[in-house]
Amino acid sequence: MIHSKRLRLWLYLVLLAVFISACGMKEDKQIKENFNKTLSLYPTKNLDDFYDKEGFRDQEFEKGDKGTWIVDSEMVVELKDKKMESRSMVLYINRNTRTTKGNFIVRELWEDSKGYAQSKDTKYPVKMEHNRIIPTKPIADDKLRKEIENFKFFVQYGDFKDINDYKDGDISYNPNVPSYSAEYQLSNNDYNVKQLRKRYDIPTKKAPKLLIKGDGDLKGSSIGHKNLEFTFVENKEENIYFTDSINFKPTK
């Protein structure tokens, strides 16, 4: 009798483990499929193409609203005993008016003598015409103006055609938020890492980890967000990382 109860308990635990494993595999598959939809946008070399790209639509969109694509790329560098500085650009690609506006942003963060966090943001308004970034206000600094005019978003040169070859990925899912992510250790020979090093002065030889993360319904949501993060260094004294996002939202 005792042996029979133990056998039933053992079978129950085995079935429970199989069920949990199957659910986990299903979630992993859904997460990868969800990310692949976003990653398929890379590369979109001509940003004007977003005027004709349809994104996920739900009840948050008003009737007749074609939506707005929001693209954002940012490089952040914080070295030991130095200010954290980030340089980024965000564009709002309005499919209704077929016009694009945004900002190039230089941000500095530091601690004052009392240990309080301080920050300073400097924004330079821009527009996009025929895949060209154009400052909408005069910029006296020629070097800065050229940096803005020559800026390229990661979506214009990033490529994830080999994403399925990435190994040892750490897939996680939190149904309570809900949020989900996939993390991979990359090498310096990775195509996207080479492209980032080509375009930015990245003061480390360490290969980055790639974190792809999102929140909202796995089946799709205009409320949720997705973004990529290449983290080269992350500790209490230094931080070096690059982030990129492409999101489709109702037009405001």
Swiss-Prot record:
Lipidation (N-palmitoyl cysteine): 23
Keyword Cell membrane: yes
Signal peptide start-end: 1-22
Cross-referenced Pfam families: DUF576
Keyword hit for rRNA processing: no
Record keywords: Cell membrane, Lipoprotein, Membrane, Palmitate, Signal
Domain of life: Bacteria
Lipid tethering residues (S-diacylglycerol cysteine): 23
Membrane topology, record value: Lipid-anchor
Localization terms from the record: Cell membrane
Gene Ontology CC terms: plasma membrane
Similarity section: Belongs to the staphylococcal tandem lipoprotein family.
Protein name from the UniProt record: Uncharacterized lipoprotein SAS2375
